[in-house]
């Protein structure tokens, strides 16, 4: 399937969805602390989104039961909110999507709960810095595979590894569209191959960072993804539009 080019009107609608996504994440960022349960946070986000005349995009998507993916400590992505109460030293990944008037926004961040270990601080910084470096590297005409190479090299230069088998993606009237954008260059693939970035494209970049091994394992809940190394992980994501030959973050907080 071809990668869709969005009109200025569509990008305006996607910007609206992105802004609401960012506001919902900012709300959670303010409320995350020791003593708060994951289900409480999920309800806060859902109530805020609905009160803004929008819809939590993840609730029911592929059967996901909640509004926010909450990935605790070793869980990289797709964690299901539970009654677990956050404790000092935890790290929590928050990934949420919003649908407004038929258009989607999608963003994620990983937060420390109080004081965390120096290794976890480096881990959180890696996914955030990898995301921003990739965004700042975007140029019209470059290949998406070049972005994958940039993401991988930024992660590995910091001593970590990208999660395999999961990727960034296009977004628009569907939460997941073409292209798929891995955080690594697949074996045998050249960076100067495949589709190129063009004006009007809208997509999500989301580095998912593991400590020692990038091979994934899905837990018994059939959603939560961890690394086979069982160590803590980190994940950041933004929705980006190509406007005026440059990358514009639609989910900037």
Curated annotation (Swiss-Prot):
Cofactor notes: Binds 2 divalent metal cations per subunit. Has a high-affinity and a low affinity metal-binding site. The true nature of the physiological cofactor is under debate. The enzyme is active with cobalt, zinc, manganese or divalent iron ions. Most likely, methionine aminopeptidases function as mononuclear Fe(2+)-metalloproteases under physiological conditions, and the catalytically relevant metal-binding site has been assigned to the histidine-containing high-affinity site.
EC number: 3.4.11.18
Catalytic activity: Release of N-terminal amino acids, preferentially methionine, from peptides and arylamides
GO terms, biological process: proteolysis
Gene Ontology MF, one: metalloaminopeptidase activity
Top-level EC class: hydrolase
Binding site for a divalent metal cation 1: 95, 106, 237
Binding site for a divalent metal cation 2: 106, 169, 206, 237
GO CC list: cytosol
Keywords: Aminopeptidase, Hydrolase, Metal-binding, Protease
CDD domains on file: MetAP1
Sites where the protein binds substrate: 78, 176
InterPro entries from the UniProt entry: Creatinase/aminopeptidase-like, Pept_M24, Pept_M24_MAP, Pept_M24A_MAP1
Cofactor(s) annotated in UniProt: Co(2+); Zn(2+); Mn(2+); Fe(2+)
Record note on quaternary structure: Monomer.
Function: Removes the N-terminal methionine from nascent proteins. The N-terminal methionine is often cleaved when the second residue in the primary sequence is small and uncharged (Met-Ala-, Cys, Gly, Pro, Ser, Thr, or Val). Requires deformylation of the N(alpha)-formylated initiator methionine before it can be hydrolyzed.
Family classification: Belongs to the peptidase M24A family. Methionine aminopeptidase type 1 subfamily.
Protein name (database record): Methionine aminopeptidase
Species, as recorded: Helicobacter pylori (strain ATCC 700392 / 26695) (Campylobacter pylori)
């Amino acid at each position: 399937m071809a990668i869709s080019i969005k009109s200025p009107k569509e990008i305006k609608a996607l910007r609206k969805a992105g802004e609401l996504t960012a506001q919902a994440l900012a709300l959670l960022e303010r409320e995350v602390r020791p003593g708060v349960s994951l289900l409480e946070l999920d309800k806060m986000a859902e109530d805020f989104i609905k009160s803004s005349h929008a819809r939590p995009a993840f609730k029911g998507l592929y059967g996901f039961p909640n509004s926010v993916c909450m990935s605790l400590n070793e869980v990289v992505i797709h964690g299901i909110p539970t009654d677990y109460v956050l404790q000092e030293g935890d790290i929590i990944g928050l990934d949420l999507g919003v649908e407004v008037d038929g258009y989607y926004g999608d963003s994620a961040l990983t937060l420390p709960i109080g004081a965390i270990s120096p290794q976890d601080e480096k881990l959180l910084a890696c996914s955030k810095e990898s995301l921003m470096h990739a965004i700042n590297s975007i140029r019209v005409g470059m290949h998406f595979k070049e972005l994958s190479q940039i993401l991988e090299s930024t992660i590995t230069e910091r001593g970590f590894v990208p999660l395999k088998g999961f990727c960034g993606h296009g977004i628009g009237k569907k939460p997941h569209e073409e292209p798929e954008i891995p955080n690594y260059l697949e074996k045998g693939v050249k960076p100067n191959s495949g589709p190129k970035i063009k004006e009007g494209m809208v997509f999500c970049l989301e580095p998912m960072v593991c400590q020692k091994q990038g091979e994934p394992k899905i837990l018994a809940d059939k959603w939560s993804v961890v690394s086979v190394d069982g160590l803590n992980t980190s994940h950041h994501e933004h929705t980006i539009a190509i406007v005026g030959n440059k990358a514009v973050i639609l989910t900037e907080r």
